[in-house]
Amino acid sequence: MIIDGGCHCGQIEYRAEADPEKVEICHCTDCQTLSGSAYRTVVPVDADSFELLCGTPKLYEKKAEDGSKRLQAFCPECGSPLYSAAPNGESGYFGVRVGTTNQRDRLVPKNQYWVRSAQPLSLIHISEPTRRA
């Protein structure tokens, strides 16, 4: 499916093709810190399909818990986290932050990882329906 979205202030907009079956929740401590929450929801998109429509994100490189390096992209104006990517395009995909997409209601998590770092009561029961409030 085609997804689009952007930052909170509107300075950065993007479009990409995503597989809604690959939406994931990450419980690593980096994602907890960077999201300001107990976890982050991400959809991987092929780097070739990702297109910046306007704006230029600020990038910085972070070494993850497992030793891998990831570029973190965020809006330089409002600070919205937009995506992560491997340095020099090594992995060929971007981890788009689902909360920045306009289709977030259709990007339902199917998997979760780094569960050993999960906060108490934050593991999502993916196979069970959730109550909408």
Features from the language model and the residues they span:
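Flanking scaffold residues of small Cys/His-coordinated metal-binding clusters
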Residues: M1-D4, E21-V23, K69-R70
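Short cysteine/histidine-rich metal-coordination sites, predominantly Zn2+-binding motifs
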Residues: K22-H27, T41-E51, E90-T101
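Helix-adjacent hinge/juxtasegments
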Residues: V43-E77, P81-S84
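Short Fe-S-cluster ligation motifs
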Residues: P57-S68, N102-L123
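Short, non-ligating residues that shape and space the ligands of small metal-coordination modules
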Residues: R15-A16, S37, S84-A85
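Short cysteine-rich clusters marking metal-coordination/redox-active sites
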Residues: G6-C9, C26-C28, C75
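Single conserved hydrophobic/aromatic residue that forms the stacking wall/gate
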Residues: I124-A133
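Cys/His-rich metal-chelating microdomains
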Residues: I12, T29-L34, P81
